[in-house]
């Protein structure tokens, strides 16, 4: 069979490059279009070059030789991408036409909507234009969820301080304030007290002015205010060590939702995720409720052909509360870990759906496997504040080393990999925690509880050597 050609809009996020490009290139010819060259790391660029039959970079971002250099690491691209959505759509259509591609995909949250419009113009399978907008704008997303038959929650669009005051009066506290256009929990804030609410809103609103997003990202209001979803851990789990929310990965094919795998989580730092354990140990009844909620949510968004990453709060009486859903792959190593545990390559599966629709070998339900658990974990400054190695009042610090001591692993849990920020790395503690991952590690074991306990012990006992500054 002749290999089909897929256009990849290459940028940050989603399925990590170290898996995506090799997996995709095994079955498809890849053409990589890079709309934001400054958002590509050196290792990402090397993988793009290695596995693509052609690479197209947006020429408008090259002014000097320095612009051809790629950073070693990047979490969020802070340079400007000032092209309006229509111009981005036209560029995608142009590149797709040059190579007569059979499908278009991206791992980046911010290009979901322009990509959907390009797919529609070219007659290619995609998420769907309105559905992509629903999945990108959290106000539209919540409205779609509330219509879809999942748990309905109070919410209000917020642009101004007056809007926020009105939301406070209507919803009350505790209240969640979310930017409608970002990802990775950036800017998500829990408002607990009426007395400090306006100051919190002003702080977040001011801080988000420093977070650059492409001009092509559009929204009707920059924030959504929502009632807080209260979890009820003991109604779902029989053992300790996890969190009161999960994520579930799935695939949409011709408008039908196909669940793939559920990840358990360890407790968050605020709204910043700390670890994902694949697969979930929840019982069959719990999994069924989660799948039902995810199906209603993603089909309710109107999504047609795409990957989905859906986050669900585990509430009282086993009610599944929809947090949000994205029309893309999960980040971190959640997609590679599904392959490690189940042997299913979701990168290839998505491209199969985009090229062949329901002829792809879609799962008949959640994947099942012999007992083996893989955890994808990060350490943040807050962990070292909690274990007493960083003062609560520190404003920044310079890392000298981070080490995991012997004797912290439980059962047959093993460390598959560990990496930490290089010596000399400066960490600004005024940033949102999600920007400040300072170490990452992967664990593997035959018992999920032992893996979860090992994560906890590492968080409590990891050794940080650093120089820090205190406020004057």
UniProtKB/Swiss-Prot annotation:
<feature type="binding site">
    <location>
        <begin position="226"/>
        <end position="229"/>
    </location>
    <ligand>
        <name>ATP</name>
    </ligand>
</feature>
<keyword id="KW-0067">ATP-binding</keyword>
<dbReference type="InterPro" id="IPR013815">
    <property type="entry name" value="ATP_grasp_subdomain_1"/>
</dbReference>
<feature type="binding site">
    <location>
        <begin position="309"/>
        <end position="311"/>
    </location>
    <ligand>
        <name>substrate</name>
    </ligand>
</feature>
<feature type="binding site">
    <location>
        <position position="324"/>
    </location>
    <ligand>
        <name>Mg(2+) 1</name>
    </ligand>
</feature>
<feature type="binding site">
    <location>
        <position position="109"/>
    </location>
    <ligand>
        <name>Mg(2+) 1</name>
    </ligand>
</feature>
<dbReference type="GO" id="GO:0017000">
    <property type="term" value="P:antibiotic biosynthetic process"/>
</dbReference>
<feature type="binding site">
    <location>
        <position position="182"/>
    </location>
    <ligand>
        <name>Mg(2+) 1</name>
    </ligand>
</feature>
<dbReference type="InterPro" id="IPR052032">
    <property type="entry name" value="ATP-dep_AA_Ligase"/>
</dbReference>
<feature type="site" description="Plays a key role in restricting the N-terminal substrate specificity to small amino acids such as L-Ala">
    <location>
        <position position="332"/>
    </location>
</feature>
<feature type="binding site">
    <location>
        <position position="273"/>
    </location>
    <ligand>
        <name>substrate</name>
    </ligand>
</feature>
<feature type="binding site">
    <location>
        <position position="268"/>
    </location>
    <ligand>
        <name>ATP</name>
    </ligand>
</feature>
<keyword id="KW-0479">Metal-binding</keyword>
<feature type="binding site">
    <location>
        <position position="138"/>
    </location>
    <ligand>
        <name>ATP</name>
    </ligand>
</feature>
<keyword id="KW-0045">Antibiotic biosynthesis</keyword>
<keyword id="KW-0547">Nucleotide-binding</keyword>
<protein>
    <recommendedName>
        <fullName>Alanine--anticapsin ligase</fullName>
        <ecNumber>6.3.2.49</ecNumber>
    </recommendedName>
</protein>
<feature type="binding site">
    <location>
        <position position="324"/>
    </location>
    <ligand>
        <name>Mg(2+) 2</name>
    </ligand>
</feature>
<dbReference type="GO" id="GO:0005524">
    <property type="term" value="F:ATP binding"/>
</dbReference>
<comment type="subunit">
    <text>Monomer or homodimer.</text>
</comment>
<keyword id="KW-0460">Magnesium</keyword>
<feature type="domain" description="ATP-grasp">
    <location>
        <begin position="142"/>
        <end position="355"/>
    </location>
</feature>
<comment type="pathway">
    <text>Antibiotic biosynthesis; bacilysin biosynthesis.</text>
</comment>
<dbReference type="Pfam" id="PF13535">
    <property type="entry name" value="ATP-grasp_4"/>
</dbReference>
<dbReference type="GO" id="GO:0046872">
    <property type="term" value="F:metal ion binding"/>
</dbReference>
<dbReference type="InterPro" id="IPR011761">
    <property type="entry name" value="ATP-grasp"/>
</dbReference>
<feature type="binding site">
    <location>
        <position position="178"/>
    </location>
    <ligand>
        <name>ATP</name>
    </ligand>
</feature>
<feature type="binding site">
    <location>
        <begin position="184"/>
        <end position="185"/>
    </location>
    <ligand>
        <name>ATP</name>
    </ligand>
</feature>
<comment type="function">
    <text>Part of the bacABCDEFG operon responsible for the biosynthesis of bacilysin, an irreversible inactivator of the glutaminase domain of glucosamine synthetase. Catalyzes the formation of alpha-dipeptides from various L-amino acids in the presence of ATP. In vivo catalyzes the ligation of L-alanine and L-anticapsin (epoxycyclohexanonyl-Ala) to produce the final bacilysin antibiotic (L-Ala-L-4S-cyclohexenonyl-Ala dipeptide).</text>
</comment>
<feature type="binding site">
    <location>
        <position position="311"/>
    </location>
    <ligand>
        <name>Mg(2+) 2</name>
    </ligand>
</feature>
<dbReference type="GO" id="GO:0034026">
    <property type="term" value="F:L-amino-acid alpha-ligase activity"/>
</dbReference>
<feature type="binding site">
    <location>
        <begin position="328"/>
        <end position="331"/>
    </location>
    <ligand>
        <name>substrate</name>
    </ligand>
</feature>
<keyword id="KW-0436">Ligase</keyword>
